């Protein structure tokens, strides 16, 4: 089916079926389906979120196939991963900027490594994405308008048991509920479209689960993760379940993330974040500390951009909530690596070899094993893990294109900072030592949940942005527009458009949640109170409902988009939370047979409560 011309470009030719099989082909000048139709296309760009880049009177958007992300067939449909640009050439998708950033990373990395004596054809950016989800009974889901319309519960009293017993994480998937069969089919369907889901297991919260794939190219892995999310939702419905991707669908139990395990290597296979393998490939002890200096400095300089990239609406409830990393952008390197880099800054030229230590179980029949000398720090947003960094703060519902666009861009900037000075006559190791000394404040090996850490982070001068709305607005500050422009990742116009899209998404999400809350109070809570003859609670509930309703209307008169987004955040994190307290207190006293909404007990205990599966 596929041929290539002399320049290596794909040349597809699809043979039309015989006329007897397709009579339309015999009806005069009807166009025939050709290979060109698979390579290129066009659509209406004004109907997608575009931040003003397109309008109804100038709506052209053009697509072309992305050769770095393999096509696949799902059901009766062939999917061709593509990139999308406007008639004017600006990117309308999230993938084109990702390609641009990875290209910049490779270009700057090749240049710096060449200065260190390591010739390479290019750099490869790999990721592995851990996708967390909730699976809840579908019959209960349909009795929760908030889950249907907003993806999270805007009210709901905690049951007598949550995750206090710590008995869900890694527990066996039992066969008497559909969760196991559902997850097996999800994995099988993913295998059939070339997505290698490696693991499946329970997570910490009740009804919370996780899938994780083998590592792969950042572009194809990003595409494939979106397909995984689609397959999860479709398959869950088949088994009488509903899949929840939102970061915080339930109050009082852990929310969901999507850990973005991130690494870079040369085209020839030298892993730049694996010190032992890198030295074996290069025989140069300077490469690893120089790469680490570039990354540490990039993280310190551009932590605001990393915080911006994870500002999904649901992450407002997770970051800093003792279940996900805090909103402070720092990195954990571990005592061993930290000590090595401190010696490097002091002038040492030793090769870094990660230490291992023996672990004895104290049982004669079980042999001791060798383990890494470093522990794991789950409170760090960007910990080093031996051959990769793990960006732990990404939200479960997110398309990770922007996250990885930012990571690639700031790393390219770190590489360029060093290589530009080397071109002027400085030594790469000397520049790396200076950068590490200046930016080492971003390294924090302690407990990110410690109440003293935010104040210490402020004293260090590293990035801490608690508000997702404020973080989104870092997209268009001068330093960041200049950074993206320098590496041709985003134009100023593209930065401004994406900020507008992100803010409008936040506003729209909150408005949907708030209006759903108002409807649920009026259509379910108040009738339940009346049915239970608990009318003394009506004034407080009605007043709370009115506050939420009035706050929604105030959004529309807030002025510009940033002001509306700031007002939406107050509505969500203050007004709606106060209303929820009132409603949840009422749920506690209304008899179960009078309460029409599905309760947390019905939603959260798929494996341990009576249900349609006969438990």
Which ranges hold each PLM region?
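C-terminal amphipathic alpha-helical interaction region
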Residues: 438-615
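Glycine-rich, acidic/polar active-site loops that bind/position phosphate-bearing ligands
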Residues: 1-245, 250, 254-258, 263-502
């Amino acid at each position: 089916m596929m041929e290539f011309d002399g320049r290596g470009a794909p040349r597809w030719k699809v043979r039309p079926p015989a006329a007897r099989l397709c009579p339309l082909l015999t009806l005069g000048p009807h166009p025939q389906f050709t290979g060109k139709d698979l390579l290129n296309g066009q659509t209406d760009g004004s109907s997608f979120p575009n931040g003003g880049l397109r309008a109804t009177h100038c709506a052209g958007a053009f697509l072309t196939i992305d050769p770095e992300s393999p096509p696949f067939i799902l059901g009766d449909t062939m999917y061709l991963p593509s990139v999308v640009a406007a008639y004017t050439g600006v990117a309308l998708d999230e993938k084109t900027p990702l390609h641009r950033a990875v290209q910049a990373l490779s270009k700057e990395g090749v240049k710096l490594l060449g200065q260190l004596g390591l010739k390479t054809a290019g750099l490869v950016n790999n990721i592995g994405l851990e996708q967390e989800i909730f699976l809840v009974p579908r019959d209960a889901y349909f009795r929760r308008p908030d889950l249907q319309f907003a993806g999270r519960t805007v009210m709901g009293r905690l049951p007598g048991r949550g995750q206090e017993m710590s008995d869900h994480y890694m527990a066996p998937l039992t066969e008497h509920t559909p969760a196991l069969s559902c997850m097996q089919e999800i994995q099988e369907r993913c295998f059939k479209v070339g997505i290698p889901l490696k693991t499946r297991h329970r997570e910490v919260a009740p009804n919370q689960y996780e899938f994780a794939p083998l590592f792969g190219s950042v572009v194809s892995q990003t595409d494939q993760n979106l397909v995984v999310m689609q397959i999860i939702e479709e398959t869950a419905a088949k088994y009488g379940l509903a899949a929840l991707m939102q970061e915080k669908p339930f109050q009082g139990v852990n929310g969901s993330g999507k850990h973005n395990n991130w690494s870079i290597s040369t085209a020839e296979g030298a892993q730049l974040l694996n010190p032992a393998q890198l030295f074996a490939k290069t025989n140069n002890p300077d490469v690893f500390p120089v790469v680490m200096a570039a990354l540490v400095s990039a993280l310190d300089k551009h932590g605001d951009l990393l915080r911006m990239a994870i500002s999904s609406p649901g992450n407002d409830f997770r970051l800093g909530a003792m279940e996900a990393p805090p909103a402070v952008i720092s990195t954990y390197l571990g005592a061993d690596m930290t000590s090595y880099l401190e010696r490097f800054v002091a002038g040492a030229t030793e090769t870094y070899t990660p230490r291992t230590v023996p672990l004895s179980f104290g049982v004669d029949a079980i042999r001791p094993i060798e383990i890494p000398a470093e522990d794991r720090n789950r409170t760090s947003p960007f910990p080093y893990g031996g051959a990769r960094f793990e960006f732990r703060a990404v939200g479960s519902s997110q398309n990770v294109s922007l996250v990885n666009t930012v990571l690639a861009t700031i790393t390219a900037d770190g590489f360029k900072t060093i290589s530009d000075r080397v071109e002027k006559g400085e030594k790469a190791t000397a520049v790396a030592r200076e950068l590490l000394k200046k930016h080492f404040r971003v390294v924090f090996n302690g407990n990110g949940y410690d109440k003293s850490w935010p104040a210490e982070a402020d004293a260090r001068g590293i990035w801490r942005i608690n508000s997702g709305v404020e973080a989104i607005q870092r997209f268009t500050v001068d330093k960041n527009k200049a950074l993206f422009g320098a590496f041709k990742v985003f134009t100023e116009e593209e930065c401004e458009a994406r900020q507008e899209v992100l803010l409008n998404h936040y506003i729209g999400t909150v408005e949907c949640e708030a209006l759903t809350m108002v409807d649920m109070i009026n259509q379910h809570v108040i009738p339940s109170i009346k049915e239970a003859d608990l009318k003394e609670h009506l004034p407080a509930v009605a007043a709370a409902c009115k506050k939420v309703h009035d706050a929604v209307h105030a959004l529309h008169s807030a002025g510009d988009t940033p002001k509306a987004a700031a007002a939406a955040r107050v509505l969500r994190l203050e007004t709606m939370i106060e209303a929820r307290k009132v409603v949840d207190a009422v749920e506690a006293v209304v008899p179960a047979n009078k309460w029409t909404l599905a309760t947390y007990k019905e939603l959260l205990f798929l494996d341990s409560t009576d249900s349609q599966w006969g438990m």
